Amino acid sequence: MLLGSVPQLDRVAIHLGPFPVYWYGIIIGTGVLLGLWLATREGERLGIPKDTFVDLVLFAVPIAIICARAYYVAFEWEYYMQNPIQIINTRQGGLAIHGGLIGAVMTGIIYAKVKRISFWKLADIAAPSILLGQAIGRWGNFMNQEAHGGEVTRQFLEGLHLPDFIVNQMYIDGVYYHPTFLYESLWSFAGVILLLLLRKANLRRGELFFTYLIWYSIGRFFVEELRTDSLMLGPLRIAQVMSIGLIVISIIFIIVRRKTGQADKRYLEK
């Protein structure tokens, strides 16, 4: 597709008859499948039945999507109150990661209780998978030309030594923008590597998951400052508030669980 004189990628991957299939959905689905593969592989190594994470994904993904959408809609209610039919339209994006995370965690807690499996064990195994899904999922935002930062020049983007397809896709309505999707994606990919390395450190159970929350939240806090489409509550950027909250809560949980003996078991214990 061409916009002005700048070639750009089409957000529609293919058409199945009259129905368009968007890259956004394909990319999100790819992230889920790769994350599932990673979690299932590690789960088997630690004695978790192979179908455990398959079952969990079947419950958690739909609930996470619903919660991600509900979270987004709640903070954009003034618009959706006037356009209620758009509430169910997610083809253009509009899924908030923090909302999805809340839904996934709630589902995981309930699932772990029903199956009588340690939630913290499941959460630790799933942590790199969740972050991998987020890293891949940001490229869905790239295809939709959303979740970008403020205005920049083409020279600025070329100075980052980005490939032309990224530079061109950041040209929206006659203006170039910060590729904040890329900053967050790279930060998340680095976090996946960190979490995979920390598996070998045999941390106390639950601490790998808290490390994920802390790592992602640090990156998200700074990236959010560049974005132009932040969900707001008065003068506050909701994602930054959530990021600070998750960092503080994670640190408190680590300290309290260690002091109270709730974190005696280690990651590699079966």
Curated annotation (Swiss-Prot):
HAMAP family in the record: Lgt (MF_01147)
Keywords from the named record: Cell membrane, Membrane, Transferase, Transmembrane, Transmembrane helix
Molecular function GO labels: phosphatidylglycerol-prolipoprotein diacylglyceryl transferase activity
Catalytic class of the enzyme: transferase
Membrane topology, from the record: Multi-pass membrane protein
Name recorded for this polypeptide: Phosphatidylglycerol--prolipoprotein diacylglyceryl transferase
Location(s), subcellular: Cell membrane
Nuclease recorded as keyword: no
EC number of this enzyme: 2.5.1.145
Predominant subcellular localization, coarse grouping: membrane
Positions contributing to a 1,2-diacyl-sn-glycero-3-phospho-(1'-sn-glycerol) binding: R138
GO biological process: lipoprotein biosynthetic process
Pathway: Protein modification; lipoprotein biosynthesis (diacylglyceryl transfer)
Keyword Transmembrane appears in the UniProt entry: yes
Function: Catalyzes the transfer of the diacylglyceryl group from phosphatidylglycerol to the sulfhydryl group of the N-terminal cysteine of a prolipoprotein, the first step in the formation of mature lipoproteins.
Gene Ontology CC: plasma membrane
Regions crossing the membrane: 19-39, 53-73, 92-112, 117-137, 178-198, 206-226, 236-256
Organism: Bacillus cytotoxicus (strain DSM 22905 / CIP 110041 / 391-98 / NVH 391-98)
Family: Belongs to the Lgt family.
Pfam families membership: LGT
PANTHER family according to UniProt: PHOSPHATIDYLGLYCEROL--PROLIPOPROTEIN DIACYLGLYCERYL TRANSFERASE, PROLIPOPROTEIN DIACYLGLYCERYL TRANSFERASE
